[in-house]
Amino acid sequence: MAKFTCILLSDGSKCQVLFYGIIGDCPALKVILEFIGHTGYHCCFYCYIHGIHVGGRGGKRQYYFENRMQLRTKRTYELESIRAVETSSNVYGHLGRSLLHDLLDVPLPNSIIVDYLHVSLLRHTRAIIQQVYAQLSPLERTKFDSGLRGQRFPHFFNRKLRAVCDLAFVKATELRNLLLYALIPHLPPFLPKEQLAHLSLYVCSIRIIHGKKCFGDKSSSMSKELFLTYYQDHSIYFEKLHNLVLHLHVHFDQLFDKHGSLCYLGTFGQEDLIGSISKNYHGTRFHGQLITYYYEIDFALRNKASSHDATDEKNIDGPLDQTDLSSMTHDIIQHHLTVCNCGNFDQCLRIYRRCVIDKKVYHSLIYTRRNSTISFLVQYYTNQGDPSFGKIRYFFTSNNKTYAVIDHHEV
């Protein structure tokens, strides 16, 4: 399909398709962009960092921390790719002119999105975990692996953690859980505090830009500041890991500002979609028609559900799974007396095992079907506005309002 071509629909209306950008891991981007690979000089898609070869014959390219980097612009990116075609040579990493110049509506390199699942998780996180694991004694490795296997998560986590000894079989989502939630809590008994603090810089940097803007417009700049400190001191704690995937993290703040949070910038969802379509084809084997077919089904289902959203949203929050544990009411009778004058405790007070708050289900300790999940652990704020943590014993309603009884956890 040519750029700016409109699609004529069956009802006679026209629909214009805009091609936003290209996302992929580094080897895939290298091919589609006609760019030098990570073993060459000037291999960054966003800047002109040169790189240094270390290790002699059979060594590696390393991209050490630089205070000032010259970024590629859309004009220089286009001109250098044309020069590469005319001279049949490597021009600052360009080996030719990519067909994406004529296809994408957002000019290169602004439309290039590196897949953080490959760069951050499958490459850099895996590499630092391997080096940390190599530092540990056999007994320490056993204890560390045992702690990871026993790590419990809320019920909406789809995957548990695997031990580092099974790292070859660990998937990207498991590495994400390990990096964001389990690595720092499990390592203090085994690592010096300086190295642990160094790792914390990377974990916090990724967490800040992984989801919503926790710090508003300052989120990306705060994340970059943490990462630059991590990048600058990286050679003190890890050997030969100043590779391209580490350097690409310098540009994550730009990706966050231009394209959104990291949790949305992944190729695995599309890979799963294409894989599913390839196995469950209907009438044709052409991927374009099949993808359109499934997207039409998805749009139809979403449009049908949207008409009920206005009424559903009003009733979705609140307690559920009522229980008949009247023996617990003595803990909350005093509270009931302050908010209600009915004097009928048995009729007014209701005990519940679960509660939906902002479309999220929270469990309590009396919900026995939670198995090994820990959706009863919550952070809450005291009357003074101080953050605290605790376990939800149970939920109850009084005077048509919902409350939770929480056992405070000392930090």
PLM region spans:
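Domain-level detector for long, ordered catalytic/regulatory cores in large eukaryotic signaling
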Residues: M1-E174, H186-L187, L191
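Terminal interaction-prone segments of large eukaryotic proteins
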Residues: Q131-V411
